[in-house]
Amino acid sequence: MSDIAITISLLALVAVIGLWIGHWKIRGVGLGIGGVLFGGIIVAHFTNQYGLKLDAHTMHFIQEFGLILFVYTIGIQVGPGFFASLRQSGLKLNGFAALIVLLGSLAVIVIHKLADVPLDIILGIYSGAVTNTPSLGAGQQILSELGLTQTTSTMGMAYAMAYPFGICGILLSMWLIRLFFRIKIDDEAKNFLKESGQDKETLGSINVRVTNPNLDGLRLVDIPGFDEKRDVVCTRLKRDEHISVPQANTIIQKGDLLHLVGEIPLLRKIKLVLGEEVDVPLSSFTGDLRSDRIVVTNEKVLGKKIRALGIHQKYGVVISRLNRAGVELVPTANTALQFGDVLHVVGRSEVLNQAVSILGNAQQKLQQVQMLPVFIGIGLGVLLGSIPFHIPGFPVPLKLGLAGGPLVVALILARIGSIGKLYWFMPPSANLALREIGIVLFLAVVGLKSGGNFVDTLVNGSGLEWMVYGIFITFVPLMIVGIVARLYAKMNYLSLCGLLAGSMTDPPALAFANAIKEESGASALSYATVYPLVMFLRIISPQLLAILLWTLL
């Protein structure tokens, strides 16, 4: 067999062994995809003993391409929620998550200077301690830029030493915080439900009878809250036992019953303007009115504003809600449509079919992947990652690299949604498949490269010392931020657990946090809020650390 054939065969063997190891669980917690790294170390130990030669060029290409696939699909997945997570509702969570990253970076600097740990080793320990594989790839990229290519294998070995406690340390910090503050889980779950009901602007609906005489004879569009900004949507109007879909120019009369959809706080306010809330059923449809869900799949309407489509003006169809990437929104006339948007519409049966023909609603398209945008995005990401940014005082220009470039481009493209007929929506199943393939390829190569001397380093070298450093980098930032967030910010414990798991981008830790109170979504919500920003910071931080520490050598 050729060296290339042997290399690919061994990579497949590593993937099989590693994924099998990753399925092992102790009390519901396992290595997950990280098992591939240890599968590579095991295989590398024996290939080193038997003197098998692997093709270096093939290994290098597979490692880099796997990393690109992984970070690009991560960006496409989290892109729609990335910028939303930076808004006011997520500022506190993202602030604490960024503080964890900052404290971990400071711990790296302290250990590097006081213990005189080599740059490649401390970056590998850092990546393993925070259980973030793209961080490892970014670190190896910047070391190559600094001319330290020969040290990238030892970086992978250090990563493997620190990785196991990186997972266990998150779980331990959750348990200790719970013990220290004597937290009662049921009380925390009740408090979260109470707080989310008051603070989170969820969508709701109410039925209101118009009793304000000042509104009699006004057009619907002239009433505050129903203008073009449309903070609240009126989907049905009942007058004299007849239910209709109101238009913008519909004249409102005293005694009309209106079915309103919007954010709960806004519904409370507009109820005070209109009249009184009534318990009269308007949700059930009579006559030829019906409600439907339409998925936007027609490339011709992507990027267009709802006003430009004229659905409401031409057909009398009201779009009451818009679900985008799992987030429910109140659509306005200026809302631009994206591929995969789910619209809740109300109208007469015959005109709803015309709305479907305009918007698409082709369910099969949701399962198809446009490959052209995928490779456009990857190509743009690689180009962006190769652009040098010259920063005064730095000895070498800073680059986003193959880890940062595709991630940034994917975040932007996912936020844009579409350009012309090109759309960057990717079905969740396809995204997950590409992401898993990418990370398996990357970790398999890292394991093969670093596994030859792993056992010797652990038994006879500095392996145990590296583990101690990793424990410090994992544990100290989590405990400091956890205590501060609970003690001073009064953060809900379930949300705090999601924050700690998200700050390490660690799915096993999220599974553990969810299991604390399975029926509560607090942990998953805070995890999803901080995940996009943390992933970006975890990729950028090792590059900044490498350049900073390299200049201080």
Curated annotation (Swiss-Prot):
InterPro entries: AAE_transporter (IPR050144), RCK_C (IPR006037), RCK_C_sf (IPR036721), Transpt_YidE_put (IPR023018), YidE_YbjL (IPR006512). GO terms for cellular component: plasma membrane. It is found in: Cell membrane. Residues 190-276, 277-361 form the RCK C-terminal domain. Its main location: membrane. GO terms for biological process: potassium ion transport. Keywords: Cell membrane, Membrane, Repeat, Transmembrane, Transmembrane helix, Transport. The keyword Endoplasmic reticulum does not apply. The chain crosses the membrane at residues 4-24, 28-48, 65-85, 91-111, 157-177, 371-391, 403-425, 439-459, 464-484, 496-516, 533-553. GO terms for molecular function: monoatomic cation transmembrane transporter activity. It comes from the Bacteria. Pfam families: Asp-Al_Ex, TrkA_C. Gene3D superfamilies: Regulator of K+ conductance, C-terminal domain (3.30.70.1450). It is a multi-pass membrane protein. Disulfide bonds: none annotated. Belongs to the AAE transporter (TC 2.A.81) family. YidE subfamily. This is Putative transport protein PM1071.
